[in-house]
Every structure is written in C-alpha cells, then in structure tokens.
Amino acid sequence: MIVTDKISNVRNIIKEQKLSGKKIGLVPTMGYLHEGHLSLVRIAKKHSDFVAVSIFVNPIQFGPNEDFDRYPRDLERDLKLLEKEGCDLVFAPSVEEMYPSELLTTVNVDKITEKLCGAFRPGHFKGVTTVVAKLFNIFTPDIAVFGQKDAQQVAVIKKMVEDLNFPVEIIKAPIVRESDGLAMSSRNVYLNPEERKAALILSKSLKEAEKLLLNGERNANTIIKKVNEVLNSEPLCKVQYVSCVHPDTLEDLTYIKDKALIAIACFIGTTRLIDNLLWGENI
C-alpha cells in the first residue's frame, strides 16, 4: 500500500496504473474510519482494479461553529485498517497541499443543496463539491464510492458529475449499522453512554416508517408525522428535520409512487446525527 501526502505523487501513480490498463476506484473520506468506510473500500475493490482512498478533513465544508477542530483524527489507525482491506493507495494531504493559496474558485450545486442538511449548514455542500471536484481531477477515477448515509451528499455529487461531465461513475453504498441499529458515523464517538442509548431512536423511527410503507401507507405526511412522534418520545433527542423526498431530485413528496427517501437529522445532546431510509431502490 502506497501512502502519500503529495498531489504530484498521486498523479504519477495513477498515470502509471492507467497505462497498464487498470480501472481506478476512489473512496473519498475524512478519516477516523469505521466499518461503514471499510465497506466502501470493499465495494470499490469489486468495481475496480486499483483502489485509492483519500483521507482529508476538509476545512471548507465546516461552518464557523461546527466541529472542524474537534473532528476525530487517527491516521495511524486508519492506515492499518486500509492495509488490512487491501487498499492500494492512500492520499492524506495537509490543508496546505489541497489549498496552497487563497481559494477563489468553488463548485456549487444549486437548489438541491438548499434543503435537508443544506438548509441548516450554509456553505457545507459548496465545500463538499469543491473538494470532491478537486479529488476527481487529482485521481481521474473511473468509479467513486459514496455512502448512502449521507444521502443528500450522494445526490449532490451525482448532479455535479452529470452537469460538469466528470468521466466517473458514482456508486452508492448501503448504510452500515451497529448491531443495535445505530448508523455508523465517525461522530458517534462524541456520544456519552446515555446519549449513545438515546441515539437508537433515529433508527427506531425509520423502522416505524418502514412498517407503515410495508403496510401500504403512501401518504408522505402520515409517515413524517409518525417519525416525528417516535423521535420526540426520546427526551434527549432534538429534531432538526424529518423529510420525505425523491432520492435523486430531493423534491418533497406528498405521495410516494415508487422511490422515496425518508431523511432525518437530530441533535442527541450536542451531537448532530443523520440517518435515512431509502425505499423502492435496491443498492
């Protein structure tokens, strides 16, 4: 496994691999890897011949009062995990390597970034699309794998790829959960034992939504109401939003015809957690 913090090295390595006919897979991460991230690496391995992982806590996607400085980091541990998974290349740049001078060019996807998480985290998705566009230019991957847990992020990146003709296929990977149902997240480390228990209310509320859907309920408001009810039954849970949208366009649904995404964001104590249920689409 090659580890580098230099863009020029990545370019040379990828060029060499492409010349030998290899298909390049990319998994962009912010590090502090968990089983969810590792599942993305495994999916990338299935769809490509050479798997690269980027580890970069991207400052431009964090708001002024968010957790950039506090965000967990452990490169040594991450590298051990990636080596075990058979990853080929790890790119772990410094902020100076990614943004050597004042950043005057950004990539911004309109409309679909203004709702769900985007409504509460202004500028977040502009930071995400800008860094992902940079990574796509650095790696020129054939495929890139993103987790469904960040459903809005997947939709936004897919739209950017479509609109700007990036020659990369975006593969969506299913949410990986702890044995008790909590969606895996690097931020789960912030939760104290009481909050960790309370956080199960997110997946429980989505299970209730799934029950309704399986029983034939198609009215989005009925489902949203039920999810809110379950979430509000947990005293430590403060709901930020519950939405029922189309998974690709993120347009609000009133009636569920085929595909739907039930997306939620909550604060458990001071920790913001997201989760979702994808209905009518197999990934």
From Swiss-Prot:
Tagged with keyword Cytoplasm: yes
Chain residues that bind ATP: 30-37, 147-150, 176, 184-187
Localization of this protein: Cytoplasm
Pathway: Cofactor biosynthesis; (R)-pantothenate biosynthesis; (R)-pantothenate from (R)-pantoate and beta-alanine: step 1/1
S-S pairs: none
Single GO MF descriptor: ATP binding
Active site: 37
One GO-annotated biological process of the protein: pantothenate biosynthetic process
Binding site for beta-alanine: 61
InterPro entries in the cross-refs: Cyt_trans-like, Pantoate_ligase, Pantoate_ligase_C, Rossmann-like_a/b/a_fold
Catalytically driven reaction(s): (R)-pantoate + beta-alanine + ATP = (R)-pantothenate + AMP + diphosphate + H(+)
A single GO cellular-component term on record: cytosol
Pfam families to which the protein is assigned, alphabetical: Pantoate_ligase (PF02569)
Protein's UniProt keywords contain Nucleotide-binding: yes
EC id: 6.3.2.1
Record's subunit section: Homodimer.
Family label: Belongs to the pantothenate synthetase family.
HAMAP family attached to this UniProt entry: PanC
Role according to the record: Catalyzes the condensation of pantoate with beta-alanine in an ATP-dependent reaction via a pantoyl-adenylate intermediate.
Protein name: Pantothenate synthetase
